[in-house]
C-alpha cells in the first residue's frame, strides 16, 4: 500500500511524498516510476541520463532487472552516472560503482560505453575535475540536457538516498560544499563518515535535474525525514544546513519514497493526515 501525505506535510510545489508498507512495494513503485521517466525522456530527447547513488539504494532497483522492464525498456538509450563516489578503487567493497555494478548494471543490457564512472586512478581533486569535464562534453552534445535557468546539466533523473544525518550524495550538514554555486562537481577530504575522501555533485546540479527521487528507509532516518520535509520543523539543522532539505528542484519534480519506519515521525505528528493512494 502506498500513501500520499498531506496536511502538516503538504508537499511543496512539484514535490510528492509516497509512503510504503514494505520494501517490495517500494521497489515495485520505484521501478514503475523510473520506467515512466525513462520512456518520457527517450521520447522527448532520445536519451535517458540518470545519476545514481550507492549503498542501500541499489537494492531497490531489482525490479528493473525483471519482467517486464528488462525486456520493454530501451536500455540502449540509458546513460549512467553517479551523484557521488568514494575515493576508493572500483573493486573496493565501498565503491558505489562496484555496488551498482554487482546489484544492477550486470543484470541489465546497458551499453558499457554509456556507463560513466568516476576515475579511481586519480587524486580526489583530479577525479572531480575529470568528471566535470566529461559531463560538460556530454552537455555540449545534449546527451545530458541543460538547464535554461543556470546552464547546469539537467539530468533526466537523479536518484538519491539520505543518511540519518540528512546528507544526500556526499553533501553533509554544515559542510562548505553546500555553499558552492558555480562548480558542478566537487570533492571533500573530511567526510564525517568513512572513507573521508569523496567526489560529489553540488546542489545546483542536483536541483537542476528534471526529476529527483530520494529513497529512504529505516526508523533511524525518521527525524531527518521530518526535518527535511516539514514546514513546521524547528531546530538548528532544519532551516539551512540539512542537505536533504536543500534539495528543491529549480524547475523539475522531487519525489520522496519512504517506508513506514522512515516516515514514522511524520505519522506521530499527523496520524490523520494520510490518504490511501494505491493498493498492490
UniProtKB/Swiss-Prot annotation:
GO molecular function, one term: 6-phosphogluconolactonase activity
Xref: Pfam families: Glucosamine_iso
Catalytic reaction annotation: 6-phospho-D-glucono-1,5-lactone + H2O = 6-phospho-D-gluconate + H(+)
Keyword terms of this UniProt record: Hydrolase
InterPro entries for the chain: 6-phosphogluconolactonase_DevB, Glc/Gal-6P_isomerase, NagB/RpiA_transferase-like, PGLS
Recorded metabolic or biological pathway in which this protein acts: Carbohydrate degradation; pentose phosphate pathway; D-ribulose 5-phosphate from D-glucose 6-phosphate (oxidative stage): step 2/3
BP term (GO), one: pentose-phosphate shunt, oxidative branch
Domain of life: Eukaryota
Transmembrane segments: none
Presence of keyword Cell cycle: no
One cellular component (GO) term of this entry: cytosol
Entry annotated with the keyword Hydrolase: yes
Gene3D superfamilies: 3.40.50.1360
EC number, as in UniProt: 3.1.1.31
Family, per entry: Belongs to the glucosamine/galactosamine-6-phosphate isomerase family. 6-phosphogluconolactonase subfamily.
PANTHER family linked: 6-PHOSPHOGLUCONOLACTONASE, 6-PHOSPHOGLUCONOLACTONASE 2-RELATED
Role noted for this protein: Hydrolysis of 6-phosphogluconolactone to 6-phosphogluconate.
Protein name: Probable 6-phosphogluconolactonase 2
Species for this entry: Oryza sativa subsp. japonica (Rice)
